């Protein structure tokens, strides 16, 4: 909803911009409840997470998910039903599949040009190999197609969240490991909101 709201603001659709922020706000409350912060969560640590989730996390999350899903679908209908919005975005900002590959375009921008790539599926990390989700690809190659990808991914994220809540395991939140030897290398690739993010790390002496 952050992206949807900002996109609407940039093109002058401020009514939906404000509605998107309203829909998003309960998510911010939830993240503050679960992590202690609205934005910079500080939960990830080497070997696990900083603290366990509260015991009632499912009871707190599910009603918010239900509400957000309903309101998001209504916002999507408003976007898809706005002919002036479509006329401004369709046919604008063309990136052909060939250009997308030539310029190494990634993420939703690539998928809006018909390039079927997604690190969550192609190089599974975290628990993505344990959930079902659709890689959202559009063939329009324009801003409208990229907008549709973002919209579809917002709905898909809600479906993923439901699965993760059902499959959340118990147990310790930090892995136990001995002293890590020096000069060991780790490489990761994850699907971020704007495309793949790669990290390279090496242990010190």
Set out the residue ranges of the language-model regions.
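Active-site bordering "gate/hinge" segments
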Residues: 1-205
């Amino acid at each position: 909803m952050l992206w949807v709201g900002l996109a609407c603001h940039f093109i002058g659709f401020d009514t939906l911009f404000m509605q998107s922020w309203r829909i998003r706000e309960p998510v911010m409350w939830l993240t503050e409840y679960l992590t202690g912060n609205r934005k910079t969560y500080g939960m990830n640590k080497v070997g696990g997470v900083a603290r366990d989730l509260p015991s009632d996390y499912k009871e707190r999350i599910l009603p918010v998910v239900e509400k957000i899903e309903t309101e998001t679908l209504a916002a999507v209908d408003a976007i898809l039903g706005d002919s002036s919005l479509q006329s401004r975005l369709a046919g604008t900002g063309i990136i052909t599949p060939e250009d997308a590959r030539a310029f190494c375009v990634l993420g939703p921008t690539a998928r809006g040009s018909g390039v079927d790539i997604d690190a969550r599926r192609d190089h599974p990390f975290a628990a993505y190999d344990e959930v079902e989700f659709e890689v959202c690809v559009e063939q329009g190659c324009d801003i409208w197609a990229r907008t549709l990808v973002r919209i579809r991914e917002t709905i898909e994220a809600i479906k993923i969240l439901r699965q993760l809540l059902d499959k959340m395991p118990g147990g310790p939140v930090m892995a136990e490991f001995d002293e890590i030897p020096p000069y060991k290398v780790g490489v990761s690739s994850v699907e971020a909101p704007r495309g793949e993010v790669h990290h390279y790390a090496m242990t010190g002496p």
